[in-house]
Amino acid sequence: MAIQSDSLSSLPDSPRIVAPQPVSPNEESIERALRPKALEEYVGQQRAREQLEIFIAAARKRGEALDHVLLFGPPGLGKTTLAHIIAHEMGVQLRQTSGPVLERPGDLAALLTNLERNDVLFIDEIHRLSPVVEEILYPALEDFQIDILIGEGPAARSVKLDLQPFTLVGATTRAGMLTNPLRDRFGIVSRLEFYNTDELARIVTRSASLLNADITADGAHEVARRSRGTPRIANRLLRRVRDYAQVKAHGVIDQDAAGRALAMLDVDPQGLDVMDRKLLEAIVHKFDGGPVGVDSLAAAIGEERDTIEDVIEPYLIQHGYLQRTPRGRTATLTTWRHLGLTPPAAASGGTGELFSK
């Protein structure tokens, strides 16, 4: 059965079409439908996939719970998908929550005591767990036990509860914010990387089939190369391009139709959107190419510091548009060329190597 695309009207006001986070509840439901169910269907992340194949197979042979898994990397790369795949491959249930939701120790205790043997507990944004909840988690991860306080005042007493063996899968975009005691309790740690164009083209082709969309190989490649190395963005662009092709290109997504659709959406051939160009232009025009501190840059473009660091910068740094230096952000030669500008003959402040041959 074909999966119905969400309508343009379902999107919030002025979302970034290249945002790596979901932009609507409708999109989240479509993501679930497009999500691969098994490791053999999972495209990309070869190192993480190969490691998980071995660790899962070994755990199943022993009849044990898989060791606790930490998945970290930029948003939209498949951390939630991998958590679901782990549960599927282990043949167990997955319980899903997030760090901000677990406000009190009792919230976590209720989840842990309801887990069946070898189940998977997935905590997204695990770096946002409160310290008091995190303390409850330590003995649960090490000994499959928790201590809960019953009663109040002088009559209160601590009771130790045994838990079924389980696997915690934690996901975070900010691995550096994890406390050392929590990080040390994960036996399997996998960093997810941005995808290359060929991998994304395979994802786009698979998703197009599930969406009952007619796409050519060069059409899939055109969508993939503008998707910023992120499957979530690739699937979102695909749905918008499908809408365009149905109205303007007889329903066929080829390279020309994809290119025209994405140009209409203001996504350039390198996958940069208005916000990316706004940041790069601010560094070049307002700060002479940098270096500029992130707080000054945030004020200049009217964005939060966290938005710049977590959402805009990772892709720009990964692809050589920005360089982080001890003195701040600096535009690279790639940025000047992308903006159609001539870089200064010599950069000051120790950044001359950015423009040297």
Swiss-Prot record:
GO terms for molecular function: ATP binding; ATP hydrolysis activity; four-way junction DNA binding; four-way junction helicase activity. DNA binds at residues 305, 324, 329. Its EC number is 3.6.4.-. Residues 13-195 are annotated as: Large ATPase domain (RuvB-L). Residues 1-15 have a biased composition (Low complexity). Coiled coil: none annotated. Residues 196-266 are annotated as: Small ATPAse domain (RuvB-S). CDD domains: AAA. Keywords: ATP-binding, Cytoplasm, DNA damage, DNA recombination, DNA repair, DNA-binding, Hydrolase, Nucleotide-binding. ATP binds at residues 34-35, 76, 79-81, 142-144, 185, 195, 232. One of its GO terms (biological process) is DNA repair. Its main location: cytoplasm. InterPro entries: AAA+_ATPase, AAA_lid_4, DNA_helicase_Holl-junc_RuvB, P-loop_NTPase, RuvB-like_N, RuvB_C, WH-like_DNA-bd_sf, WH_DNA-bd_sf. Residues 269-357 are annotated as: Head domain (RuvB-H). It catalyses: ATP + H2O = ADP + phosphate + H(+). Has 3 domains, the large (RuvB-L) and small ATPase (RuvB-S) domains and the C-terminal head (RuvB-H) domain. The head domain binds DNA, while the ATPase domains jointly bind ATP, ADP or are empty depending on the state of the subunit in the translocation cycle. During a single DNA translocation step the structure of each domain remains the same, but their relative positions change. Homohexamer. Forms an RuvA(8)-RuvB(12)-Holliday junction (HJ) complex. HJ DNA is sandwiched between 2 RuvA tetramers; dsDNA enters through RuvA and exits via RuvB. An RuvB hexamer assembles on each DNA strand where it exits the tetramer. Each RuvB hexamer is contacted by two RuvA subunits (via domain III) on 2 adjacent RuvB subunits; this complex drives branch migration. In the full resolvosome a probable DNA-RuvA(4)-RuvB(12)-RuvC(2) complex forms which resolves the HJ. The RuvA-RuvB-RuvC complex processes Holliday junction (HJ) DNA during genetic recombination and DNA repair, while the RuvA-RuvB complex plays an important role in the rescue of blocked DNA replication forks via replication fork reversal (RFR). RuvA specifically binds to HJ cruciform DNA, conferring on it an open structure. The RuvB hexamer acts as an ATP-dependent pump, pulling dsDNA into and through the RuvAB complex. RuvB forms 2 homohexamers on either side of HJ DNA bound by 1 or 2 RuvA tetramers; 4 subunits per hexamer contact DNA at a time. This is Holliday junction branch migration complex subunit RuvB. It comes from Bordetella bronchiseptica (strain ATCC BAA-588 / NCTC 13252 / RB50).
